[in-house]
């Protein structure tokens, strides 16, 4: 079992709170995955820390609160993980190339994903924490 808050092994490079809760492949008009990835990237500018020099792999802890329409928990992480993937940033023709933390979103680079979902009676929100594994 891994403890992401273990600062001897992990470095937190992003702790981002946004006032929305999105999922991958929402089929409603005007809600494209590319637009959502760009929203996350734009929100991360000025908040994200530089990646450590030697990263073994990456981990995500995502906490979502949602009012109203239910979300599929398995679709929450896809858009977020893709937001910081260099390959996806290039495919999106995004100007946020400096936010590419890993070349691809495979197990070779992203090994831990924790998603915590909560119902809210007041607001939608998402907290994204990204950790670099720096020591075994």
Where are these regions (language model features)?
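Acidic, proline/glycine-enriched N-terminal capping motif
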Residues: 1-136
């Amino acid at each position: 079992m891994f403890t992401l808050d273990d600062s001897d092994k992990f470095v937190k490079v992003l702790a981002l709170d946004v006032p929305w809760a999105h999922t991958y492949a929402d089929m409603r008009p005007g809600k494209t995955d590319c637009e959502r990835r760009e929203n996350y990237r734009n929100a991360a500018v000025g908040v994200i820390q530089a990646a450590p020099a030697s990263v073994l792999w990456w981990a995500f802890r995502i906490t979502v609160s949602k009012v109203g329409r239910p979300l599929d928990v398995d679709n929450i992480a896809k858009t977020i993980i893709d937001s910081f993937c260099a390959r996806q940033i290039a495919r999106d023709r995004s100007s946020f190339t400096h936010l590419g933390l890993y070349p691809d979103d495979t197990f070779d680079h992203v090994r831990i994903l924790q998603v915590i979902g909560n119902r809210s009676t007041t607001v939608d929100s998402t907290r994204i924490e990204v950790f670099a594994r720096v020591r075994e």
